[in-house]
């Protein structure tokens, strides 16, 4: 097995164990045994349980980042891309947290640890928003004076919605499809885009 495949297998096994048993209850030995690798192999890749926890979070964020990149590359109008990016970000974060079971509590308890690992993802997402906003501005779709500022604000607004969205506290009882027109109206008006009635 190649170095990257071995490392990825260790990360996948660790994610499953963290989700099932929690971070505190999972040992490095548990990860080594469940992966069918020796402790020496595990310690070759990761110095500590925290290192492998960071790798699990990074792996989850890479999944999200890849999907956001796919949306940004679509040949659709920039105003549609922004709405799709917003909903994809929120739904993928919720799916990741829910899918990881016991890791969910750890995610919220160690938010500063998660923030440290998230920095690269956050920077990449802001750059993605800049690209889409520039595209919309150049096409005359958005009336934006400062693309960088609008990209920062958009990213941090979405990030601020993550926890309430995960807990289902936003648009309680409404479907995603029912909320999209209202969200689009708010976003488009902020971007200087007229909504056609």
Where do the PLM segments sit?
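Short secondary-structure transition hinges
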Residues: 90-130, 138
